[in-house]
């Protein structure tokens, strides 16, 4: 275990020596964020590992990253997929023998609680932005609902957490520029927590492989609305699934660089997922679910595929990947370091 950890640490150190913390410093203030190429991480907090009760199953089923948020930041990742839900812990007060419930916005992947919290991520990003004010962060979040958890307080807890960090959060507008976002965070939520967002809401998220830019999702902030073309086709377990995924990735890349699309939607945003899984298992569940090896096998195909298709200066949009910042995970060449480099270089 020590050798693996040391190897990973050396790999990250070598990467950050070339791709320092401040790659956005090279980007002009007036560049629109929607026209950038930004590396991102799918289920970003699984790199922290899982809480003790979820460690065994979580590592088998739900691991999509090797690096934690600080390490992802160090290699150049600037977009983070977060899945908070309410975690309840009951403790007994010794004086009254009464049980008290403590509620935390824990980051989950499915049923499994990672070792990071929603507030914890903001603390990491706040420190990173203070140390590197030329940079910015984008959070894409959703409520990771479960029948096994009481999420009834989720909306209020998310709103409170975002209000506590309101000095960092930028209101969404489709023509948002790098200069307007430097040193701050754009929070885009796929679930609502109040009538108007602190950042932006996304409606119409898609999971198919079609990539139809003429039927875009919508993004809206307090006063302005924009369009989004998203590719998040994630289940490659069927025959032909990998081919369909690769074609969808390439299709969105072409859409993001199409003159026709730019003419009709000059401020369209793009999110392209290389993430997904190829294998399922019933090792810990009654029904087949994704596995960490399935995520690795998919990443070995998709991360390399997209890295090879990024040529010169082009727009990739937000590229949400598994195993960002490392080229090897488990038994697979996941090419997450190579893809992060390619995305950054395309700016």
Where are these regions (language model features)?
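Aromatic-lined carbohydrate-binding surfaces of glycoside hydrolases
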Residues: 77, 82-90, 147
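Fungal secretory targeting signals
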Residues: 1-17
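Conserved, mostly hydrophobic/aromatic
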Residues: 72, 83, 139, 187, ...
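Aromatic-lined glycan-binding groove of carbohydrate-active enzymes
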Residues: 184-288
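Long, acidic (Asp/Glu-rich), low-complexity accessory segments flanking structured domains
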Residues: 17-75, 88-131, 136, 195-200, ...
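Acidic, His- and aromatic-enriched active-site or binding-groove loops in soluble protein domains
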Residues: 114, 118, 158-174
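Loop/turn elements at helix/coil->beta-strand transitions in domains of secreted/extracellular proteins
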Residues: 75-80, 132-138, 182-184, 265-267, ...
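Active-site groove signature of glycoside hydrolases
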Residues: 86, 133-148
């Amino acid at each position: 275990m020590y050798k693996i950890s040391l190897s990973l640490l050396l790999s990250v150190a070598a990467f950050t020596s070339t791709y320092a913390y401040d790659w956005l410093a090279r980007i002009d203030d007036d560049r629109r964020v929607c026209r950038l190429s930004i590396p991102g991480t799918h289920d970003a907090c699984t790199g922290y590992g899982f809480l003790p009760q979820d460690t065994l199953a979580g590592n088998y089923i739900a691991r999509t990253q090797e690096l934690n948020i600080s390490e992802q930041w160090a290699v150049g990742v600037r977009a983070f997929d977060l899945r908070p839900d309410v975690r309840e812990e009951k403790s007994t007060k010794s004086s009254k023998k009464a049980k008290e419930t403590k509620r935390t916005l824990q980051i989950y992947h499915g049923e499994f609680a990672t070792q990071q919290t929603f507030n914890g991520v903001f603390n990491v990003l706040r420190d990173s932005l203070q140390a590197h004010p030329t940079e910015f962060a984008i959070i894409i979040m959703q409520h990771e609902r479960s029948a096994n958890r009481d999420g009834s307080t989720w909306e209020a807890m998310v709103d409170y957490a975002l209000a506590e960090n309101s000095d960092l959060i930028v209101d969404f507008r489709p023509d948002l520029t790098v200069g307007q976002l430097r040193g701050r965070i754009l929070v885009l939520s796929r679930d609502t927590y109040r009538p108007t967002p602190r950042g932006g809401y996304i409606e119409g998220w898609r999971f198919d492989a079609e990539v139809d830019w003429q039927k875009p999702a919508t993004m809206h902030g307090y006063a302005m609305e924009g369009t989004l073309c998203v590719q998040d086709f994630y289940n490659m377990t069927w025959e032909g699934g990998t081919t369909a995924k690769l074609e969808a990735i390439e299709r969105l890349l072409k859409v993001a660089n199409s003159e026709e699309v730019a003419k009709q939607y000059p401020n369209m945003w793009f999110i392209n997922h290389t993430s997904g899984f190829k294998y399922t298992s019933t090792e810990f569940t009654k029904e087949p679910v994704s596995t960490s090896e399935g995520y690795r096998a998919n990443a070995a195909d998709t991360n390399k595929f997209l890295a090879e298709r990024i040529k010169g200066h082009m727009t990739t949009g937000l590229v949400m990947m598994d195993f960002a910042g490392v080229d090897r995970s488990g038994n697979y060449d996941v090419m997450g370091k190579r893809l992060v480099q390619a995305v950054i270089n395309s700016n």
